[in-house]
Amino acid sequence: MAQKHPGERGLYGAHHSGGASLRTLGPSVDPEIPSFSGLRDSAGTAPNGTRCLTEHSGPKHTQHPNPAHWLDPSHGPPGGPGPPRDAEDPDQSETSSEEESGVDQELSKENETGNQKDGNSFLSIPSACNCQGTPGIPEGPYSEGGNGSSSNFCHHCTSPALGEDELEEEYDDEESLKFPSDFSRVSSGKKPPSRRQRHRFPTKEDTREGGRRDPRSPGRHRLGRKRSQADKRKGLGLWGAEELCQLGQAGFWWLIELLVLVGEYVETCGHLIYACRQLKSSDLDLFRVWMGVWTGRLGGWAQVMFQFLSQGFYCGVGLFTRFLKLLGALLLLALALFLGFLQLGWRFLVGLGDRLGWRDKATWLFSWLDSPALQRCLTLLRDSRPWQRLVRIVQWGWLELPWVKQNINRQGNAPVASGRYCQPEEEVARLLTMAGVPEDELNPFHVLGVEATASDVELKKAYRQLAVMVHPDKNHHPRAEEAFKVLRAAWDIVSNAEKRKEYEMKRMAENELSRSVNEFLSKLQDDLKEAMNTMMCSRCQGKHRRFEMDREPKSARYCAECNRLHPAEEGDFWAESSMLGLKITYFALMDGKVYDITEWAGCQRVGISPDTHRVPYHISFGSRIPGTRGRQRATPDAPPADLQDFLSRIFQVPPGQMPNGNFFAAPQPAPGAAAASKPNSTVPKGEAKPKRRKKVRRPFQR
């Protein structure tokens, strides 16, 4: 920034719209003494040779101060000197301060002369620079305090001992307590007298060796003043009152707006009610028509939207199915290519192996792996101490191997000799389940977790492993002692030769008995199945098989005349045809079930017309009472003949000695009439049946 002449620029600190301004009135004889207008200023000469300029405002104020301008922290004090500008050079500012000091001297002389002519007397306040203050002058709008008062504090007399930090802090305190001049005025209209300022006298350190102070630019430091605590409390009280006033005003306007809004809603509701009262019957018809029109429109829009969505859905489903087909085709193609590559690679490897002779080597390798020598070496390695220690380390969990962990998870409760890895708590719980078993019935091999064919070495190894896990000194389980007693009892049995031999003989006897009982029960089961599914034949004195059919008694017989199924009764015997009449099948209702007895009917040589409406024959299962004719039902107390035959075979009783020894016992024919006789079990209906002598029941032989 180029340096300007004092006559070409205004004094710093003058407001752009105020009445106090410094300007030149044209060329003068002395360039250092410019002319002034609009202010009554006074200048005095200090003992150190500097001049002080004191500015006084006019008696009338044409414009009130703007509080917003004072509250803005970006603006400096209106009447005081501001901080140095960033673009100015310190040397230039120092030169300008020297020039302005000369101007201040001239101004002070002229203002003193003018003030004496006006007849105004001012109270002078001595200062370090002998400049006379004017506390009685009304406070102007551009004073430092922001309350319209002019300052008697000369910026030339400011002690340089006040550092930049201290001055800035004082200025910040003043800025926070600035209020509009309206609050500081007295209610009577009189202007309050200005307070007497305390000036800080320079110290010895502040002066130079020649006795003069270090000239500093008045614009380099902001002017600061100290205020009393009472003024601060007063400012804070006024500031709180102003905020409370603004808050009350805002609440009042909010209440007014709320009342207006409620009134508008009430007015709208009244108009609506009044409009509803003036409705006519024709309006309802018009409303119905209007609703119908809009319903039709909405229905049309819904139909269009539904069609659009359905078409989109169908298109999406079609695209998705096509995509799935394409994906499946690509996967099949990739699978085919992969299999083709595998086949080609395998053929290439086989051909390469044939050329290099790898096939013979592979055959030799597999044969060597299957050789007895290698198996013997593996067995010796498995029985060696290093291998056993390694297995023990793995069992205790000191060496965690992934394949061993999988083996543990898979085997679970496998025997210890086959590689079972269990926790001590699991072993204690397993042994406690056998604590209530008597010692005579205890299975020592099951307790030790080994097979019954285990050797003495395997038994001792299993006992040691379990003893380490369940011993009360090693395991802190509350019932570890009971588990160890069970283990000790099992070890006493297998460790003593006599006890072990006795246990093995007892086990062999139990096994033999159980085997014989199992054989008997299996044979009995087979005989019962055979007895339940066979029928006695009086012609061949044998048995024929019968097959249970999946038919209900209510719909058992097929009738060709009615083309439907008829119900059947107990003992009914009928025939049905199949395969265009080429195959005849015989059925009977016995024990509430329908059976296929074609084999028995073929042996009896029974001829029955198939698919008839009436039942042609009836089977009798019990003895007839003399003097009765017609159908005979089996008595519920009479046992079946096949079960009697089965019992007779068990107790070795001939069938002829038992009553009702067969199903259909034929009567004893007379001599010479054997050829003409027929089995009485298949006597046609309506014919007289020969009477049979009642047999005496005999008890079973025991």
Swiss-Prot record:
Compositional bias per record (Acidic residues), positions renumbered to this chain: 88-103, 165-175
Disordered: annotated segments: 1-148, 165-229, 658-702
GO biological process, one term: protein transport
Limits of the J domain: 443-507
Positions of disulphide bridges: none
Subcellular location: Endoplasmic reticulum membrane
Ranges annotated as spanning the membrane: 250-270, 300-320, 326-346
Superkingdom, taxonomy of origin: Eukaryota
GO annotation, cellular component aspect: endoplasmic reticulum membrane; membrane
Membrane disposition: Multi-pass membrane protein
Biased composition (Pro residues): 75-84
Entry keywords, A to Z: Chaperone, Endoplasmic reticulum, Membrane, Protein transport, Transmembrane, Transmembrane helix, Transport
Gene3D superfamilies reported in the protein's UniProt record: DnaJ domain (1.10.287.110)
UniProt KW Transmembrane keyword: yes
Segments of skewed composition (Polar residues): 113-133
Subunit annotation: Interacts with the FxxxFxxxF motif of DRD1 via its C-terminal domain.
Record's protein name: DnaJ homolog subfamily C member 14
Organism: Homo sapiens
